[in-house]
């Protein structure tokens, strides 16, 4: 699902109009077969023009260019070949294109072909093709990707262009080192003694005099009901002591389920470190014990050799989370992530007390979970690659290229892997909420079931259409934001509900086999394209039969049926905000309002719109009775770039989300955060007391269009995930409760300094030592002052090193300890404790 490429309201309309304009007219070719003994090697380069070169081909666009060079010994013929590539942001042919034509194939897949008059490209020759992109293409992650060649005499074979380069981006309007320096100026590093003892900030704590010293392995004492948590505690202590049982008379780590007086919620805990009594961890439940152990882990030495012992500060922590739901949405449909990658994410979530993995398993570009009885869902829907027909795979997307072996384009979780993920999460007291997208964003399922129907029909099976999701007679014309025209399940077909029932029953069975009962299923509900269903005979017949008058009625009918399926399996229903929201006209403006149809059904909606007229949408839905998970795009979408830069990957459709953006999020108050101008909030609705009770919690969101390597997953998540954990667990900070901005500002500055100091001095060093995570290391800020260069960093504790000749610094380069007075091209980079560098910044001091 990418409701996210095009922002809401006015900006969304503008972006959609650009996208529509970028669709090229389909061109048909009659090409004679060309026999080629060997494919000529080629080099492809894509380069974005400077903003000063604004094109007149399309408004709000920028020029670019493909440069195709024949690097082989044979000519590339004048006809009989096609260049395919993906481009999320859209592309059109530029002015004076020569004898080539460009068209969109499907979704983000485009192709470029020679037309009549094109001359062969001899060895060493270069073809230049002018292109036009929307001006939202501002970093390399959004550039064309995954190019490959196909020759007409071998139409099923896609040949990857390995020698593909994206030229460095122009730095027009990019965030500068000077701007970064100014943003970092307010950060005042704090000593550890002034920071909370554990992360996220606990509800309350008391530091006492003295220490508890463990010179030998302590005894872990726990009742049988906490056996799993006791085993986790033993494993946590293993690196610090020799193997074997605790010695007689050793100090104790005592675990107990007990009342947590004054602390509400099943995850509340009390951690008491006493020099005489040892460690006593009591909690309202086993989950609370797990959260307390996560805190205790942070108090252990970062690194220690066995038998060196452990010294713990005398301390009392009484803690409970602010929000019961603290989630992360991980998209593995657009680009697949391995089981090992998911387990690593669960480890991170457990460390920082997040308790829900919203697992986005299906979308237009992939179906990632094995469903017994429907093998086509993975045999077709889990594979991407080049093919003339969608008989055994989906088309390339997001740079996956022609090869079905690409591990990010293709892949799924077999039954055993999914069960292992569930059990791994459950052991860490993390609930997995799988998402099966419907009725939109369902192309992988729609195509897979069409392949199944054709196969069974050819075999003479009378029930070939048992799970068909598309009406064969449907003449509806629509286009999703991702440019698909065939991605919607049809609510007029009984087979659609048979499919949903089958999938839901199998998901329930998978969870039961894991010993982790499924409680909630997320059923999508976002971005059904305008025009879908409108010319479907099956839908028209259903509407006549059920006395439905509008497409909104058809929507409600669909989700009433879906809700009944989930109810039959005793499941709670969750979905994106669109499931329960409607657009209505009020006076001279439109606004998103709560539909009364499902408001008393116990459904939970994930609300992502929080800008451009939707600042109060979460309030309206919660006030109406819907459960609400706050997942605001402009604050908690981790697929967005941190700021404008040609070096920072990520989407920009909802703005930019840096570490401080997440930290600054104020739950319950998107209206105040959005604007101080009363004209902008005049029609906005506040959160009622009843509505407040319907807010379930917060969720960070990572869609994966740009995540096609393991390091990118870490880079996009961390350290922003830490700010999410702080905001979801920690008490409401003082600065959010101060209505006077002049008084709130210094409180906020102090809280921000404390947060970055804690993650820089305590959290990340432990992560460096214990859990290899390639988190984003921010580039330093730089400023020229009195002939020298000053440098600063967003995260205290990282070391800064510099060069004076423009070369990339290493950890062996001089360390920044004050103003850099050398004359030259100054380049500075930050390094973690393992000597890993972040992106460098440079400033000319000549």
Where in this protein do the model-derived segments appear?
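Acidic, contiguous N-terminal accessory segments
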Residues: 38, 143, 148-324, 574-583, ...
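Asparagine-centered strand-capping/turn motif at beta-strand->loop junctions
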Residues: 67-73
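Active-site neighborhood of glycoside hydrolase catalytic domains
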Residues: 480-602, 613
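Short, compositionally stereotyped local motifs that mark structural "simplifiers"
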Residues: 37, 221, 743-846
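Flexible, acidic glycine-rich loops studded with aromatic residues
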Residues: 572-785
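Feature activates predominantly on carbohydrate-active enzymes
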Residues: 268, 272-512, 516-520, 699
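Low-complexity, acidic Ser/Thr/Pro/Gly-rich terminal tails and inter-domain linkers that flank the onset
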Residues: 38-59
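Short acidic, flexible loop segments centered on an aromatic residue
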Residues: 73-106
């Amino acid at each position: 699902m990418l409701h996210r490429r095009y922002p809401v309201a006015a900006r969304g309309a503008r972006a959609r109009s650009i996208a529509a304009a970028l669709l090229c007219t389909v061109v048909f070719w009659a090409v004679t077969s060309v026999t080629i003994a060997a494919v000529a090697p080629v080099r492809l380069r894509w380069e974005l023009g400077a903003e000063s070169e604004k094109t007149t081909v399309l408004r709000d666009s920028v020029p670019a260019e493909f440069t195709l060079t024949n690097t082989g010994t044979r000519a590339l013929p004048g006809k009989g070949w096609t260049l395919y590539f993906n481009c999320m942001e859209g592309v059109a042919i530029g002015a004076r294109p020569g004898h080539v034509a460009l068209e969109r194939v499907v979704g983000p897949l485009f192709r470029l072909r020679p037309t009549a008059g094109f001359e062969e490209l001899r060895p060493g020759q270069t073809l230049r093709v002018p292109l036009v992109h929307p001006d939202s293409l501002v970093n390399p992650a959004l550039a064309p990707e995954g190019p490959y060649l196909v020759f007409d005499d071998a139409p099923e074979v896609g040949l990857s262009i390995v020698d593909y380069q994206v030229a460095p981006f122009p730095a027009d309007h990019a965030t500068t080192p000077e701007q970064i320096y100014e943003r970092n100026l307010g950060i005042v590093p704090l000593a550890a003694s002034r920071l909370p003892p554990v992360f996220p900030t606990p509800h309350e704590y008391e530091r006492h005099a003295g220490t508890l010293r463990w010179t030998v392995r302590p005894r872990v004492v726990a009742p049988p009901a906490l056996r799993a948590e006791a085993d986790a505690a033993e494993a946590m202590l293993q690196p610090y002591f020799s193997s074997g049982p605790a010695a007689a008379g050793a100090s104790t780590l005592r675990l107990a389920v007990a009342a947590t007086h004054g602390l509400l919620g099943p995850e509340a805990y009390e951690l008491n470190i006493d020099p005489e009594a040892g460690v006593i961890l009591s909690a309202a439940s086993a989950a609370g014990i797990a959260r307390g152990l996560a805190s205790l882990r942070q108090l252990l030495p970062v690194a220690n050799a066995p038998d060196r012992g452990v010294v713990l500060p005398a301390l009392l922590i009484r803690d409970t989370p602010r929000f019961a739901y603290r989630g992360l949405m991980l998209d593995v449909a657009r680009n697949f992530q391995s089981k090992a990658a998911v387990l690593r994410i669960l480890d991170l979530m457990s460390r920082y007390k997040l308790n829900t993995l919203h697992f986005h398993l299906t979308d237009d570009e992939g179906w990632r979970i094995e469903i017994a009885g429907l093998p086509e869902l993975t045999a077709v829907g889990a594979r991407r690659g080049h093919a003339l027909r969608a008989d055994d795979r989906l088309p390339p997307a997001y740079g996956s290229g022609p090869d079905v072996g690409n591990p990010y384009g293709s892949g799924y979780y077999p039954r055993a892997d999914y069960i292992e993920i569930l059990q791994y999460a459950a052991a860490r007291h993390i609930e997995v909420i799988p998402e099966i997208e419907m009725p939109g964003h369902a192309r992988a399922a729609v195509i897979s079931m069409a392949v199944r129907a054709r196969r069974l029909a050819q075999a003479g099976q009378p029930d070939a259409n048992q799970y068909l999701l598309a009406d064969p007679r449907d003449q509806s014309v629509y286009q999703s934001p991702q440019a698909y025209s065939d991605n919607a399940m049809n609510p007029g077909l009984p087979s659609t509900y048979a499919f949903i029932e089958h999938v839901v029953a199998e998901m329930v069975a998978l969870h039961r086999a894991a010993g982790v009962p499924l409680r909630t299923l997320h059923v999508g509900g976002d971005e059904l394209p305008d025009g879908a269903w409108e010319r479907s005979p099956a839908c028209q017949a259903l509407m006549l039969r059920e006395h439905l008058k509008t497409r909104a009625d058809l929507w409600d009918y669909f989700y009433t049926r879906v809700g009944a399926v989930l109810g039959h399996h005793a499941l709670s229903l969750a979905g994106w905000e669109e499931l329960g929201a409607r657009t209505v006209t009020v006076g001279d403006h439109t606004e998103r309002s709560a539909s009364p149809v499902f408001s008393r059904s116990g459904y939970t909606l994930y609300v992502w719109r929080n800008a451009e007229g939707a600042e109060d949408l979460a309030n309206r839905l919660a006030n109406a009775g819907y459960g609400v998970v706050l997942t605001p795009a402009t604050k908690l979408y981790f697929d967005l770039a941190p700021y404008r830069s040609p070096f920072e990957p990520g989407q920009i459709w909802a703005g930019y989300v840096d570490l401080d953006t997440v930290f600054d999020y104020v739950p319950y108050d998107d209206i105040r955060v959005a604007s101080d101008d009363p004209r902008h909030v005049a029609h906005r609705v506040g959160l009622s007391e009843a509505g407040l009770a319907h807010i379930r919690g917060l969720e960070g969101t990572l869609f994966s269009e740009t995540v096609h390597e393991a390091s990118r997953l870490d880079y996009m998540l961390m350290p922003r995930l830490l700010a999410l954990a702080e905001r979801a667990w920690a008490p409401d900070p003082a600065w959010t409760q101060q209505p006077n901005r002049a008084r709130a500002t210094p409180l906020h500055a102090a809280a921000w300094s404390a947060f970055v100091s804690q993650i820089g001095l305590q959290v990340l060093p432990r992560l460096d030592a214990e859990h290899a995570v390639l988190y984003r290391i921010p580039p330093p800020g730089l400023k020229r002052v009195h002939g020298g260069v000053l440098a600063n960093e967003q995260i205290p504790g990282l070391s800064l090193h510099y060069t004076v000749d423009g070369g990339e610094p290493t950890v062996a380069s001089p360390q920044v300890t004050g103003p850099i007075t050398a004359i030259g091209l100054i380049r500075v980079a930050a390094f973690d404790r393992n000597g890993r560098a972040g992106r460098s910044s440079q400033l000319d001091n000549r």
